[in-house]
A protein has these predicted regions:
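Short, gly/Ser/Thr-rich active-site loops of penicillin-recognizing serine hydrolases
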Residues: 295, 329-351
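Short, well-ordered beta-strand elements
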Residues: 301-302, 312-329
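Short, surface-exposed loop or secondary-structure junction motifs
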Residues: 63, 116-307
Length: 351
């Protein structure tokens, strides 16, 4: 065979092999995230193992009018991912011997009806209080937006519980709004100040903030949107967006990486309390975290859904792996996307 023909055959072989090669790990991830490309509302995703960033993607727009792009320090509303921070604040007060898991609601907020003597702090943490969701109780024309104390005012008018505390599970934002007010009542500090001074500052989470309109600012803020068939509508705030305890913290993948590296607050409380936080009860819910098995690995995780935002975080303690996925659009649900990212990674690493 002529040398030129040999070269051609070798070249053709390389082309064929390359063309048939399976998509790379990063290509498969990028395919999943295609809907978030500019000029759409965007996404910040980071997968971290130990000290190493395995993969990071920041795509799309944080704010459409200014065409501000999403970056690692872009702050998204965490929505219900906030709950583990509220739970941690309560556990820190238990560490300070100012509360116990068995402390009753009426011992702190005596204005509640008699049933409050049967509701414990642990019931509130694990959605077992029997209190109803507060959202349907909020008047439609209420101004200004309801805050945590306003939730307390509504709930104390509830005459009976949905079920006996501790006997059933009903996911509810009400308990976590109450927990924020309990922190304020016991400490005399605003909840946002407690989080800043006791959690964010010691943990070097410089971007994170529990947002209170007119009192603090959100650096590098992402605005929330709803993407329709014909238009994109700003839906950044709802009637419930001023409630802090159930979903009012803003943070970034940069700060959540720092949070991963300091063990999600492990150093701020005793090992006994951290273990209690991560112990599943009814419906496998701990204190602000869901605990289950995923692909054979223990997983702590939570989703967050608020007006204009959908988020997901998952931590695998046995392999020190954390996925954080933050978006500033009302849909789609990012839980399936996050779990597919994890499956792709586990497949690559043979985990």
């Amino acid at each position: 065979m002529q040398p030129s023909m040999i070269c051609f055959v070798l070249f053709l072989s390389v082309v064929l092999v390359t063309g048939c090669a399976a998509p790379s790990f990063e290509d498969r991830i990028d395919d999943l995230l295609t809907p978030y490309q500019s000029p759409q509302p965007g996404l910040a995703m980071r997968l971290v193992r130990g000290e190493q960033v395995v993969i990071e993607r920041t795509i799309g727009l944080a704010e459409l009018d200014s065409l501000q792009t999403v970056g690692a320090t872009t702050n998204f509303r965490l929505a219900s991912i906030t709950k583990h921070l509220t739970a941690l604040a309560i556990l820190m007060l238990i560490e300070d011997r100012r509360l116990t898991l068995d402390t009753r609601l009426n011992a702190i907020l005596p204005q509640f009806p008699e049933y409050a003597e049967r509701i414990s702090i642990q019931h509130l943490l694990q959605h077992q209080s029997g209190l109803p969701d507060y959202e349907p109780l909020v008047p439609l024309d209420r101004q200004p937006r309801i805050r945590d104390q306003g939730v307390v005012n509504l709930l104390q008018e509830v005459s009976e519980l949905s079920f006996e505390p501790g006997t059933s599970y009903h996911y509810s934002n009400s308990g976590y709004a109450l927990l924020a007010v309990i922190v304020e009542t016991i400490t005399g500090q605003a909840f946002e100040t407690f989080l800043e001074e006791r959690i964010f500052n010691p943990s070097k989470m410089s971007q994170s903030v529990a947002f209170v309109q007119g009192q603090n600012e959100i650096p590098n803020r992402a605005i929330g949107y709803t993407v329709g068939d014909a238009e994109i509508i700003e839906t950044d705030q709802s009637d419930y967006s001023a409630v802090l305890g159930d979903g009012g913290v803003y943070s970034s993948i940069a700060d959540l990486t720092t949070w991963h590296r300091v063990g999600f607050g492990r150093a701020l409380i005793s090992g006994r309390l951290f273990k209690a936080m991560m112990t599943p009860a009814l419906e496998r819910y701990g204190f602000g975290w869901r605990i289950d098995q995923f692909e054979g690995q223990t997983r702590y995780h939570h989703s967050g859904s608020a007006s204009g935002f959908r988020n997901f975080i998952a931590h695998f303690p046995d392999i020190d792996l954390t996925l954080m996925l933050l978006t500033n659009r009302a849909g789609p649900d990012v839980l399936p996307i996050g779990e597919e990212i994890l499956r792709i990674y586990f497949e690559q690493e043979s985990i």
